[in-house]
């Protein structure tokens, strides 16, 4: 089941599947994982698959929206309407502001994260094998949400929106006042309040990104361990139950990321 003819031990197999296809931003050459690499690298595979899945989402939902009819809907239109209705209901329950951005943002996050997570159900050797033997790639990882750079980048985008809504709804003065005069409303406690509120604010994107990354990385690692440590004829014994259970994790993590985004933006939009 090895994706490379040079891989001879389970340890090498597991390590190989945890390597990203990286581009050295200083030399613009692919990184050789057998040698030390610099900090300035770009995970090409994570970027490619995340953008590809985002484009697939836009294409499918865009075509369904343009071809939507008021009559009896087809299967795809019914499915899209079900997803949109579910997300819209979640937004209405949790966000009570007037912004028209939240519902489309929540829909994009839910479907996009779900599609990225769904890549974890592909056979672990399929795309890496094709990438190596057809395209000559040294490594390939196909689950963008198992890359901490992707999840923290998405969380950073949410953090920027939190700051934007906080300033827009409360003004700069109100936002600064919230950071310096809560929870203790006295000037002497400004340093303490600033530390407490600052940590609380910064912990939101960090926990948001690391939660998704941790769950998807662990799920991917279990699939790799099953493939790397068991004979090919017995892998299905563990693969099938774990894949069925992992479907729940995939959906749940996409839902949690969406819900926390809505909640954080709702909190930022509250006027005190």
Curated annotation (Swiss-Prot):
Record-annotated membrane-spanning stretches: 41-61, 101-121, 143-165, 221-241, 243-263
Membrane-topology descriptor: Multi-pass membrane protein
UniProt cross-references to InterPro entries, sorted A to Z: ATP_syn_F0_a_bact/chloroplast (IPR045082), ATP_synth_F0_asu (IPR000568), ATP_synth_F0_asu_AS (IPR023011), F0_ATP_A_sf (IPR035908)
Record keywords, A-Z: ATP synthesis, Cell inner membrane, Cell membrane, CF(0), Hydrogen ion transport, Ion transport, Membrane, Transmembrane, Transmembrane helix, Transport
NCBIfam families: ATP_synt_6_or_A, PRK05815.1-1
GO molecular function, one term: proton-transporting ATP synthase activity, rotational mechanism
Family annotation (PANTHER family): ATP SYNTHASE SUBUNIT A, CHLOROPLASTIC
Subunit and interaction comment: F-type ATPases have 2 components, CF(1) - the catalytic core - and CF(0) - the membrane proton channel. CF(1) has five subunits: alpha(3), beta(3), gamma(1), delta(1), epsilon(1). CF(0) has three main subunits: a(1), b(2) and c(9-12). The alpha and beta chains form an alternating ring which encloses part of the gamma chain. CF(1) is attached to CF(0) by a central stalk formed by the gamma and epsilon chains, while a peripheral stalk is formed by the delta and b chains.
UniProt record similarity statement: Belongs to the ATPase A chain family.
SUPFAM superfamilies named among the record's database cross-references: F1F0 ATP synthase subunit A
Main location: membrane
CDD domains in the cross-refs: ATP-synt_Fo_a_6
Pfam families the record matches: ATP-synt_A
Biological process according to GO: proton motive force-driven plasma membrane ATP synthesis
Protein name, UniProt field: ATP synthase subunit a
């Amino acid at each position: 089941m090895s994706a490379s003819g040079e891989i001879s031990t389970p340890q090498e197999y597991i390590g190989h599947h945890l390597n990203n296809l990286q581009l050295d931003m200083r030399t613009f050459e692919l990184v050789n994982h057998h040698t030390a690499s610099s900090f300035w690298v770009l995970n090409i595979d994570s970027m490619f698959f995340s953008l590809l899945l985002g484009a697939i989402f836009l294409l499918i939902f865009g075509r369904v929206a343009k071809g939507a009819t008021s009559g009896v809907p087809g299967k795809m239109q019914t499915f899209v309407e079900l997803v949109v209705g579910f997300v819209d209901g979640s937004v209405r329950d949790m966000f009570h502001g007037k912004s028209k951005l939240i519902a489309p943002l929540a829909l994009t996050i839910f479907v996009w994260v779900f599609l990225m997570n769904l890549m974890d159900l592909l056979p672990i050797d399929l795309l890496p094998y094709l990438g190596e033997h057809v395209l000559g790639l040294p490594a390939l990882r196909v689950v963008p949400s198992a890359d901490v750079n992707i999840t923290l980048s998405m969380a950073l985008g949410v953090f920027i929106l939190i700051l934007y809504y906080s300033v827009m709804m409360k003004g700069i003065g109100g936002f600064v006042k919230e950071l310096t005069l809560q929870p203790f409303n006295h000037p002497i406690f400004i340093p303490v309040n600033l530390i407490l509120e600052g940590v609380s604010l910064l912990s939101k994107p960090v926990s948001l990104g690391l939660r998704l990354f941790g769950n998807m990385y662990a799920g991917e690692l279990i699939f790799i361990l099953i493939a790397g440590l068991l004979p090919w004829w017995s892998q299905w014994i563990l693969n099938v139950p774990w894949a069925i259970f992992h479907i729940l994790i995939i959906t749940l993590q996409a839902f949690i990321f969406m819900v926390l985004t809505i909640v954080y933006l709702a909190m930022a939009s509250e006027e005190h």
